[in-house]
C-alpha cells in the first residue's frame, strides 16, 4: 500500500492564490454535504485543498471531517482520471456526521459517472 496510496505533501493545495484561482476559474459542484471546486493544473498529479469553517463545528468535528476527506482523496486519487486537477472541498453543515463510506460515495459521485467515466 505504499507509493501512490500515500497522501504526500506535494498533493496538498497550500497557497491562497491557488485556492482563489480554483474558486475563480474552476468548475463548481454542490452536494448535500459538500461544495467542490476543481480546475485543471499543469502538474503530474491531483492536489487537494480543504475548507472547513469554524462556525459550524468544534475542533473535534472539524478535524474529523478533514481526516475523512483526506482519506477519501488518498484512497481514490488514482480513480480520478487526467487531466490533473486542483480540488477544493468545502464542508457544509452535517458533513461531520457522515461515515467514511458516505464521504467516499458522495465525493466520488461528483467525479465519476455510473459507468466509471469522468464527468
Swiss-Prot record:
The keyword RNA-binding applies. Disulfide bonds: none annotated. Residues 1-24 are annotated as: Disordered. One of its GO terms (biological process) is tRNA 5'-leader removal. Keywords: Endonuclease, Hydrolase, Nuclease, RNA-binding, tRNA processing. It comes from the Bacteria. It catalyses: Endonucleolytic cleavage of RNA, removing 5'-extranucleotides from tRNA precursor. Residues 8-21 have a biased composition (Basic and acidic residues). GO terms for cellular component: ribonuclease P complex. Its EC number is 3.1.26.5. RNaseP catalyzes the removal of the 5'-leader sequence from pre-tRNA to produce the mature 5'-terminus. It can also cleave other RNA substrates such as 4.5S RNA. The protein component plays an auxiliary but essential role in vivo by binding to the 5'-leader sequence and broadening the substrate specificity of the ribozyme. HAMAP family: RNase_P. Consists of a catalytic RNA component (M1 or rnpB) and a protein subunit. This is Ribonuclease P protein component. It comes from Syntrophobacter fumaroxidans (strain DSM 10017 / MPOB).
Amino acid at each position: 500500500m505504499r507509493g501512490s496510496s500515500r497522501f504526500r505533501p506535494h498533493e496538498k493545495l497550500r497557497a491562497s492564490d491557488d485556492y482563489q484561482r480554483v474558486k475563480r476559474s474552476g468548475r463548481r459542484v454542490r452536494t448535500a454535504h459538500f461544495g467542490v471546486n476543481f480546475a485543471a493544473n499543469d502538474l503530474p498529479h491531483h492536489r487537494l485543498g480543504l475548507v472547513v469553517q469554524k462556525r459550524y463545528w468544534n475542533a473535534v468535528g472539524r478535524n474529523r471531517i478533514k481526516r475523512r476527506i483526506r482519506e477519501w482523496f488518498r484512497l481514490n486519487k488514482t480513480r480520478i482520471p487526467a487531466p490533473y486537477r486542483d480540488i477544493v472541498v468545502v464542508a457544509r453543515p452535517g458533513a461531520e456526521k457522515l461515515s467514511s463510506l458516505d464521504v467516499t460515495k458522495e465525493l466520488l459521485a461528483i467525479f465519476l459517472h455510473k459507468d466509471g467515466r469522468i464527468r
